[in-house]
Each structure stands twice: as C-alpha cells, then as structure tokens.
Regions:
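Bacterial Sec-dependent signal peptides at the C-terminal "C-region" and cleavage site
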Residues: 3, 7-25
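Structured, non-membrane catalytic/scaffold regions adjacent to prosthetic-group chemistry
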Residues: 279
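Beta-rich accessory regions
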Residues: 256-273, 282-484
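Beta-rich carbohydrate-recognition and catalytic domains
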Residues: 20-173, 177-225, 229-273, 288, ...
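Generic cytosolic/nucleocytoplasmic N-terminal low-complexity/intrinsically disordered segments
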Residues: 1-2, 239, 437
Length: 484
C-alpha cells in the first residue's frame, strides 16, 4: 500500500511539474514564418525601437506576454548579427507604476538609439548606453536605458519626459540626432485638442534628452513617425528627407532641425493590408551606408498557433528619379541570399495562353523567393497563383495590362511597365507574401493562411503572348535552429 501511495505522489508531482512548464516552441508550426521574425509565443505588434550596436541589430517590439491578444503591452526584445537569424531575449520594458491593467501605463511603441556622448550621464565603463523612448499609455512619454546592450534596463527616474495630456493622444516618440544643428529631435504623433483634422506629427528639440522644446506641427499623418535623409540616385549632393507614417505612406521634403517642409505629394510605399508602422534602424555604421527598414505585419489570424504576429523582411531604402518624379525604393536586404537552397531558373520562355502549359508546375513548397522579369508582349494580363492545392485555387497575384495595376488579396497598386516589362520579386513564407514590383518601386505585404499541403504554383497569362525573359525561384532555409 505504501508503494502505491508513493508512486501516486511521484506521478502527481511529475504531472504538476510538467504542466507548469511552458510548451516548448518548435518553430515549425503550420503558420510559423520560417524566414521572417516572429515571437516565441504570445502577441507581437509593431516595431518599438530598432538600433545597431557593436555588430548587433537590436529589435524591440510591442508584446503581450500574457496571451495572443493585444493589450498588457510590454516591449519585447531580440537581436541579430546578420538581420536574418534572431536571438529572443527577455522582455525589456515592463508597464509603468506597477500597472497590471490591460491598457493603463502599458509600454507602447517608440524608438531606440545609442547615447554615444553620454548625454544622460548614465554610462558605466566603456560600454555605451542604449536608450529607448516609449509611450506609457495614459502616463506620458518615457525613457529607459541599458548599460549592457539591452540585457537589463533602468527606467529614467524623472519620467515622464513629456507628461500625459488627455487632449492630444500623444504616442510613438521617434528620437534622432540632427547633426547640422547639434540637437536631439523628437517626432511625436499628436491629435491637438482631440481634433482629427489636426492629427499629425509634432517636432521637439533637446540638448540633453530630458528637457524638450516644442518647435512645430505637421498635420495630416497617422501614428508611427520616422524621418531620414536619403540620397537621390545615390548622389551625395542631392538629398531629400523622407517622412514616413504608420500606414505605409511617405512624403519627401526638407528639414531644418525644427520644421519639416513638404516638397512632394503623399505617396504610398506599401499597399498591403497587413503592413504596419515601419521603422528604420538607427546607428548603422557609415561603412555600411544603408538605411534599413522593418515593419510589422498585423491584423492576421494565426489560429491555433502559440504566437500572434510577425515582422516584414528587412528592406534597404533608397530614393530614385523615375521620369519626372522621385520615389522611395524598398528592396529586401542582400543578406537574404544566405538562405537560398535549391534554385530553379528559366530564360526567354514564350508563353501562349490556352495551351494548358504551366512553366512552374514542378515547383512546390511554402517558403520561396520568386524573382522574374516579364515582357508583356501582347497579353492582357499575367500573374501567379500562389499556394494552390487539390481543393484550393490559391492566392492570385495578377497584373492587368490595360489598367496598369497589380492586385493581390483585394489590394490594387498602380504600376506602369518599364520598356513594356514588369519586374516582380516575391517573398513567400508560411503565413505571408511580400511583393516588390519594378525593383522596389511599389510593394504589397499581406498575410496568407493556407492548408499544409497547398504548395503548388501556376504562372498564367491571358489574351496574348507573354515572354518570361528571366525567372528565378529559390527554396528558402529556415532561420530557426529548432525547425531543422
């Protein structure tokens, strides 16, 4: 009898111990992105600070460690040495005032940078301080700093640096250094007087990162501001400042350290329904010279998954003159090439509609990069069916020649051919598709959720001939060690 009781106790103890452990994350679930960043578990929203330091790309992101729904927002943390493979870190920033409320004093997206000159005076030893500015919901704009590259964090004792104002909905502080004026600049989303007509970005300046002076306000923008100076056609004597907002729009202009002066109409960088709140990495070395952007992909439903949300693939930004205009160009960073596995390629294939011939019939998989240059010849439309199956038609990406539009999942992009040709660069992962058209001139980022065995692809054209000048398809490696 004693042995039976003892065995029962051991079984109960083992059951309790097992039940108390978090479920192991295998990174190979049905909808787990294999080469886009996603959290180990629970909800992830938008980027909340991107900074490079000592060979590491650090990413902070909106995160609910309690579940898969939005709320109880903390700032999660991960880093990478190559923008591809990511190491998950402990939660960086917790809600303020010991708040356990779903919304009050929770940590919402902001920005991150390096305090090179120890302006705050918090540096210990040779390691430069990392600084994060963030919105504490209902509790103002706040600051935290780290002595050890983000492993541990201290909140500034004088928080909030900008007090909460119930009449302006202030959020998403973007802090950057403006070299010509030797000032710190903060862009802050605001809705002065709770008037939607006035919502936009306010500009503040500071010498010490603590005391901020209001300078100007630019109406007509919604959340998640960012500002960077880029060369036009890579010419150092011809630059524009690029102001971006949370819904994928941007505007070009000049910036004197206090006021942004628009010099273009508002334009759209990404037309996808899940693209959200882009940010640029700060502190990228001059020897690299790139401006690298990341955005959230939110609004999808990762049903049955231990996580919710993913990021876009990191992109390099540039400005290019096209005809009489200047446009923002987004292209996947070159580091993506290290993920290439098996390659398929075709050149100068003439496709005639109605023959039932699918050039890419043998292609299968759920993680691909598809790059192609297509001469429209006399076709009326062409495109691809992505992730087809025995019982499903897949997701249609189609270019309409007459209308000069590219469409995906109900999102339609105006896109003119160049020399009667369309270029497509498609990043396909288990729960997303990103399309970069005409060498990054336009993009569409959307979440898709297919059945496990839906791994077929169809290249089609209608109304006339299509010349596939060049087509390359790469099977992609997983970035997650646990998924191999």
């Amino acid at each position: 009898m004693k042995n039976i009781v003892f065995a029962a106790v051991l079984f109960t103890a083992a059951f309790i111990l097992t039940a108390s452990r978090p479920v192991k994350v295998v990174f190979n679930e049905l909808y787990r992105p294999q080469y886009h960043f996603s959290p180990e578990r629970n909800y992830m929203g938008n980027p909340s600070g991107l900074v490079f330091i000592d060979g590491e790309y650090h990413m902070f992101y909106q995160h609910n460690p309690k579940g898969n729904e939005e709320g109880f927002s903390h700032l999660g943390h991960a880093y990478s040495t190559d923008l591809i493979h990511w190491e998950h870190m402990p939660v960086a920033i917790f809600p303020d005032n010991l708040s356990e409320d779903k919304d009050f004093c929770t940590a919402l997206p902001g920005s991150a940078f390096v305090d090179h000159n120890n302006v705050l005076g918090f540096q210990k030893g040779p390691q430069k301080s990392l600084v994060v500015f963030y919105t504490s919901s209902g509790c103002g704009q706040r600051m935290a700093y780290s002595h050890d590259k983000g492993q541990t964090w201290n909140k500034y004792p004088g928080n909030p640096v900008i007090p909460y104002d119930s009449t302006d909905h202030a959020a998403n502080p973007k802090v950057l250094w403006h070299e010509p004026t030797s000032k710190w600049v903060m862009l802050l989303y605001r809705m002065p007087g709770n008037d939607e007509r006035k919502q936009g970005f306010s500009f503040y300046t500071s010498d010490n990162l603590v005391d901020w002076e209001y300078q100007s306000h630019l109406a007509g923008f919604f959340k998640s501001p960012d500002l960077t100076e880029l060369r036009v056609n890579n010419r150092p004597d011809d630059t524009r400042w690029v102001l971006t907002e949370g819904e994928g729009e941007y505007i070009l202009g000049s910036f004197d350290g206090k006021k942004f002066t628009p010099e273009s109409i508002r334009m759209k960088s990404d037309w996808g329904k899940n693209y959200s709140a882009s940010q640029n990495w700060s502190n990228i070395p001059a020897s690299d010279g790139r401006t690298i952007q990341l955005a959230g992909m939110t609004g999808g439903e990762w049903t049955g998954m231990p996580f919710q949300g993913q990021m876009t693939f990191p992109c390099e930004l540039s400005l290019k003159k096209i005809n009489t205009g200047i446009f923002l160009i987004r292209q996947p960073v070159k580091e993506i090439e290290q993920l290439y596995q098996k390659e398929y390629s075709w050149k100068n294939e003439n496709l005639i509609p109605g023959l039932g011939h699918n050039l890419i019939k043998k292609i299968g998989g759920d993680c691909l990069r598809i790059k192609g240059r297509f001469d429209l010849k006399n076709c009326e439309s062409f495109g691809l069916m992505l992730r087809t199956g025995k019982k499903t038609q897949g997701t249609e990406l189609v270019y309409n020649v007459k209308r000069e539009t590219l469409s995906l999942l109900g999102q339609t992009v105006p896109l003119s051919p160049v020399d009667n040709k369309i270029h497509l660069d498609i990043l396909l992962d288990r729960s997303s598709v990103e399309v970069f058209a005409n060498n990054g001139r336009a993009a569409i980022s959307c979440n898709i959720f297919n059945q496990e065995n839906d791994k077929g692809y169809i290249l089609f054209n209608t109304g006339g001939e299509l010349l596939v000048e060049e087509l390359e398809i790469y099977e992609m490696k997983s970035i997650w060690e646990a998924a191999e």
